[in-house]
């Protein structure tokens, strides 16, 4: 969503775009799982490192880029930074619009990377999407290392930072495939929880979205997620206006 927002899409365009592609990106076909298991049983090997082809993500982003006349990072109306993790070095990697001249231990800053590759890398959820190979890197979801990357923006000199994330304490174990995915996601939450809490304190304002009515990779939860996000923002409206100001007193 950060990428399509940076493309200059309006809220209605983002809603339409999300609803159009949600099923493509989120649906997990049980047949693919059984096929992978059958291949493993017969050949004693797994051909892919994910259930879904990560190229699907890149294709969706390229459609959005075509729609808004965007060729890459530097065509975006605003600067964009995207986080991912390299499985080979276990280092965090940050795609940026321009070279910010930053240096930090175990963080690689990358520029001139195709926008669709950067988004695919950042969304390559372990075991669900295939990893993203690019140059000497093998990328997976950035949330596996830093699920609320506030420090990155502070390092880049951003004056005030609003951190928005889902309420990670809202977790209910489940059974079946949905339960399996939730456990994997929960494990990532556990690994990154200390960093998330530090990021919340570092931000000028941190807002958590209560998402009791949504589930990871649920196909029909776009409208509910949008509403929950809207409710969370409006609940902090006064704080937002006080900290970040507004150009319109009626906003």
Give the residues covered by each predicted segment.
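Patatin-like phospholipase
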Residues: 3-251
């Amino acid at each position: 969503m950060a990428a399509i927002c940076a493309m200059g899409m309006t809220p209605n365009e983002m809603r339409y775009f999300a609803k159009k592609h949600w099923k493509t990106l989120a649906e997990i076909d049980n047949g693919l799982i059984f096929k992978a298991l059958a291949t493993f049983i017969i050949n004693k090997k797994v051909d892919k490192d994910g259930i879904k082809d990560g190229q699907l993500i890149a294709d969706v982003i390229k459609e959005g880029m075509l729609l808004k006349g965007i060729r890459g990072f530097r065509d975006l109306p605003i600067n964009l930074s995207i986080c991912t993790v390299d499985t080979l070095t276990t280092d965090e990697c940050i795609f940026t619009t321009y070279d910010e001249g930053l240096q930090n231990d175990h963080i690689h800053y990358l520029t001139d990377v195709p926008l669709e590759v950067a988004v695919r890398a950042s969304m390559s959820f372990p075991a669900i999407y295939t990893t993203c190979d690019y140059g000497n890197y093998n990328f997976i979801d950035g949330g596996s290392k830093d699920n609320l990357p506030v420090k990155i923006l502070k390092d880049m000199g951003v004056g005030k930072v609003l951190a928005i994330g889902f309420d990670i304490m809202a977790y209910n174990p489940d059974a079946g495939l949905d339960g399996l995915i939730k456990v994997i996601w929960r494990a990532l939450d556990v690994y990154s929880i200390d960093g998330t809490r530090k990021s919340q304190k570092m931000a000028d304002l941190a807002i958590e979205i209560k998402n009791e009515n949504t589930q990871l990779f649920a196909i029909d939860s776009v409208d509910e997620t949008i509403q929950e996000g809207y409710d969370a923002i409006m609940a902090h409206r006064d704080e937002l206006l006080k900290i970040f100001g507004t150009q319109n007193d009626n906003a």
